[in-house]
Design a protein with these regions (language model features):
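Ribonuclease/tRNase effector modules and their secretory precursors
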Residues: 1-80
Length: 80
């Protein structure tokens, strides 16, 4: 996980609002995504299934460098 960074927004807001999230899950999704795509605003989206979330899909948003994690949340609408 050393190669990944986290924005201040992720550290102070995302982890506060979604205290159940683990940074390890986010990095695992980026390392082995089911799907990834560019997003507006020079960001990238990654989706992956997380067994610890009862098999739900986690969407992870990074900055354009693809190593700085900015946001993450379970995505109910994602269809693999």
């Amino acid at each position: 996980m050393a190669r990944y960074r986290f924005t201040e927004y992720f550290e102070k807001e995302v982890l506060r609002k979604r205290a159940y999230l683990k940074k390890e899950w986010c990095t695992r999704v980026i390392d082995n995504p089911l799907r990834s795509e560019p997003q507006e605003g020079n960001r990238h989206r990654f989706w992956g299934q997380v067994p610890e979330l009862e098999g739900r899909y986690l969407r992870v948003i990074t900055l354009e460098d693809k190593v700085t994690i900015h946001n993450a949340f379970p995505d109910r609408r994602f269809k693999p």
